Amino acid sequence: MERKEVIVSEQELARQKEFTRKMREMNDRRTRTPLALVDTFGCQQNVADGEVLMGMLREMGYELTRDENQADVILLNTCAIREHAEKRVYGHLGRLSHTKAAKPDQIICLCGCMAQQKVVADKVKNSYHHVDLVLGPQAEWRLPELLHEVYTKNKRVFSIENEHGRIAEDLPIVREGGVRAWVSIMYGCNNFCSYCIVPYVRGRERSREPEKIIEECRGLIAEGYKEITLLGQNVNSYGKDLGTDYDFADLLAAINAIPGDYWLRFMSSQPKDATNKLFDTMARCEHVAKQLHLPVQSGCDRVLKAMNRPYTRAKYEEMIAYARSVMPGMVLTSDVIIGFPGETEDEAMQTVDLVEKTQFDALFTFIFSPRPGTPAAKMDDPVSREEKQVWFEKLVDAQNAISAKKHAAYIGRTVKVLVDGESDDEAFPLAARTEGNRLVRMKGDKALIGTFAKAKITDSNTWALYGEVVEE
C-alpha cells in the first residue's frame, strides 16, 4: 500500500469530530451525565486501544464508570489469541443481557480482535440480540459515527470491513495512573505464524511516522510519566513500510535522546527481525531497560518450521548469546507453546531442554489453542490434551525452578525500582518493578507511588521479590 493509503485523512478525521460533536450535543440534552464503561481483555496493544476508546467516549460527553448496571454504553474490548479469552467474553456477553433487560436503553458494543472475525460477528448477530454494535480494531477510530448511527437509526450496526488497516493519528487518549504509558508505534502483522489469528484481524504491518511517535513520547515525559512501553505486533519490523532506511533501533535511539528520568521498554519482538544493531542500541541507551522479551515458541526446528517461524534454535541461541554479551545481566523473557499439532514428546522435551540451557528469567507458557481460520487449526493433532498437560507441567516445573533461583540471587542487593501502585500484600503494601520488569512487593511510604526508589531485596519466591525502601 502507498503511504497515503495507510494514513486516515484529515477529512475523514474531521468527519469523526463532527459526529463527536453531535454525540456530545445529544448527551448534553440528557437530564444527567451519561456513563460509559470500557472492559479490556488481552494484550497490551488492547490496553492501548482501550485508552483511545475511553478518550473518544469522554470527548463525546461520557463519564467513565466501572458499574455495568449504571453504564449507558458498555464496550467489551476483546482478544482473539486464545480460546479461553473468547469463552470469557461470550460469558460476559451473556451476563450483560441481564443488565440490558433492567436498562433497555443501554448500548452494548463488542470491539477488539474478536469482533473482526466474521464467525464471531455472525454468532453475535444470531445469538446475542442485545448487542447493538460490533466493530473490529481497524474501524475503532470510527466509533463516534457508528455509535451515532446506533442511537439515531435505532438499529444494530456491524462494522468488520476486511481492509489491510490504516493509521488514525491524534485521537484522544485517556491514560490511567500517570506512571506507565503504552505507545503504539505500528499496527498489524505480516508474519502469518501458522497458529496465530493476529494478521487476519489486525491487518498488514503499518508504521507510524517517527516524528509522531517521538512527539508523543516527549509529551509523556514532560507530563511526568516514568515508563514508556513501545508497542507493536512485531516492533522489529518497524519502518519497513516507510520507504527509508529508518528502523526500530533508530527510533529507540531517538526517543532515548529525550531528556528526563524514565525507562523505555518495547514489545513484542520477532526473532527473525532481531538484529545486533538493536542489541547494541539497547546496550548504549541509558533510558532503555536492559530487558528483552523475545518469543521463541519452540526449541525444536521441525516444530518452528511448522509454526512458520523462520529461524532455527541455533540462530535463536546465537542472538541471545550476543545480546547477553553486550548487556551483561540483561533480563530475558519469552513465550512458549507446548502441544503444537504433530509435536511429539521428544520435540516437546527439546523445548524444555532449550529453557533449561537458556535460563530465561520468566516464561509465558501456553498449551496450543487452535484458532479458527489459521493453518494450524486444520493440522492433524493426534496427541490428547491430557498428554500435552504432562509436557506442559514439565516445562512449567523447569522454568519455576529457574525463576526461583534467579530471584533468590537478588536477596541482599539494593536495586532501582519504579513504584507504580499498591500491593495486595498487607505486609508489603507497595508494588514496584525493577529495570528488568521483575515484580517487587515492598515496605515503604505510599507517597512513593509514581517515583523511582531504591529497594533492598530481603526475600523472594518464584514469582516476586520482597524488600524495603532504603534511603539513597
Predicted feature locations:
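Terminal RNA-binding accessory module
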Residues: 6, 378-472
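Short flexible coil/turn linkers enriched for glycine and charged/polar residues
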Residues: 176-179, 189-191, 288, 298, ...
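Conserved SAM/AdoMet-binding glycine-rich loop
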Residues: 105-110, 117-119, 222-345, 356
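Glycine-centered loop/turn positions within well-structured domains
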Residues: 141, 191, 236, 301-302, ...
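Conserved, mostly hydrophobic/aromatic
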Residues: 193, 213, 230, 266, ...
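Proteins enriched for Cys/Gly/acidic motifs involved in redox and nucleic-acid/cofactor modification
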Residues: 1-238, 277, 292, 314-325, ...
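Radical SAM enzyme [4Fe-4S]-AdoMet core and its adjacent flexible, acidic
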Residues: 43, 239-260, 307-310, 370-401
